């Protein structure tokens, strides 16, 4: 059975197949830095787990206390963690969107072509 973590706050950062040349699908680390600041202030007792692809050096500006990284994990483990997170911040991706549809807790939505559900919070 996979080693599944249930994060307090899960942030999906889409990387791998997208980069800064694809504005419609890419959210910069600076934008995520603002999101993390908001989350750390709003949820002062929770930790944040970032789910993404790449090397830890790709996220140097996001590294701080209470922020952990799960990079290059299996799709199944990452998806399950996003679905079960107490707070989920979606990326601009159908993968994130699918997890958000199944997540029964708090979901934060970053605007892209899939429309948010009424109970999601817009970032």
Regions picked out by a protein language model, each given a short descriptive name:
Residues 38, 43-122:
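Donor-binding and catalytic core of enzymes assembling or modifying cell-surface/extracellular glycoconjugates
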Residues 1-43:
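Secretory-pathway luminal glycosyltransferase catalytic domains
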């Amino acid at each position: 059975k996979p080693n599944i973590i249930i994060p307090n706050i899960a942030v999906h950062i889409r990387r791998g197949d997208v980069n800064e040349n694809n504005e419609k699908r890419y959210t910069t680390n600076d934008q995520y830095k603002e999101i993390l600041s908001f989350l750390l202030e709003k949820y002062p007792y929770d930790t944040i787990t970032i789910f993404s692809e790449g090397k830890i050096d790709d996220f140097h500006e996001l590294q701080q206390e209470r922020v952990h990284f799960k990079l290059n994990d299996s799709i199944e483990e990452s998806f399950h963690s996003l679905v079960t997170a107490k707070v989920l911040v979606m990326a601009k991706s159908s993968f994130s969107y699918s997890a958000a549809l199944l997540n029964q807790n708090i979901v934060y939505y970053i605007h892209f072509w899939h429309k948010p559900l009424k109970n999601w919070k817009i970032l």
